[in-house]
Curated annotation (Swiss-Prot):
GO terms for molecular function: large ribosomal subunit rRNA binding; structural constituent of ribosome. PROSITE patterns: RIBOSOMAL_L14. GO terms for cellular component: cytosolic large ribosomal subunit. Keywords: Ribonucleoprotein, Ribosomal protein. This is Large ribosomal subunit protein uL14. Gene3D superfamilies: Ribosomal protein L14. Belongs to the universal ribosomal protein uL14 family. It comes from Tetrahymena thermophila (strain SB210). Transmembrane segments: none annotated.
Amino acid sequence: MAAARGRGGQVGTKAKVSLGLPVGAVMNCADNSGAKNLYTIACFGIKGHLSKLPSASIGDMILCSVKKGSPKLRKKVLQAIVIRQRRPWRRRDGVFIYFEDNAGVIANPKGEMKGSQITGPVAKECADIWPKVASNAGSVV
């Protein structure tokens, strides 16, 4: 019998968003956990093809390490949720939207954030999937 595989803290279905953060991308950490930069190591749920880098988008959970920040967080493999990306994507109403930076928040596998507040806006696509992130967001765009 196969082991049951849960979806963690995700709620509902994920909207289709253009992939904007390949493996190796560095993004800002937008919470108050003590990390400054997050280096993308892997993306969850990507099967992949030969010679194609796995990429993440808004609302995806990624595996990352902290490049700048508090010594307690550095040199450890952590999980994070992408909340902003520079690459434009099209919403269902036809509007193209993008942010001025790439940003993520450190979270556990259930989607509960390590920090208690988020600096800057959070994409609506991410807030719909991750309710714990939405509750800590200052503004949802």
